[in-house]
Design a protein with these regions (language model features):
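Periplasmic OmpA-like peptidoglycan-binding domain that tethers envelope proteins to the cell wall
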Residues: 29-35, 48, 56-125
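Periplasmic peptidoglycan-binding/tethering modules of Gram-negative envelope proteins
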Residues: 1-52, 85, 89, 125
Length: 125
């Protein structure tokens, strides 16, 4: 249940970074093509019901800092809502936060690098 590598990253390493959760530009609605990734994460969470997780949204540097911070928080909340509503994860186990553009994993100098910075992280609490 759940991809073994994803399960290992979250449960053993304590952090799972995902790039398979998609949103339209400046929007916080989870796109349908994200459901495969969400389904795998939900399977892991439902398999280990006592684990609590923080969902953290990140953006690239396009746009104003404050707008990106707000957007990242709204996106993390949307991911939580989808996990609860569509995949039966207990929402009491999930907290959300957003970092905006403050923690890039790559320079924001190319479209490919910006895509790396647009991510959702799941952190075991």
């Amino acid at each position: 249940v759940g991809a073994p590598d994803m399960r290992n990253k979250l449960m053993t390493e304590g952090k799972l970074v995902t790039y398979g959760i998609y949103f339209d530009v400046n929007k916080d609605v989870v796109k349908p093509e994200s459901y495969g990734t969400l389904k795998e994460i939900a399977a892991i969470l439902n398999e280990v019901p006592d684990v609590q997780v923080k969902i953290v949204g990140h953006t690239d540097s396009d746009g104003a800092d404050a707008a990106n911070l707000d957007l990242s928080k709204r996106r993390a909340a949307s991911v939580k809502n989808e996990l609860v509503k569509s995949f039966g994860v207990n929402g009491d186990r999930l907290v959300t936060d957003g970092m905006g553009e403050s923690q890039p994993v790559a320079p924001n100098d190319t479209p490919a690098n910006k895509a790396l910075n647009r991510r959702v992280e799941f952190i075991k609490l």
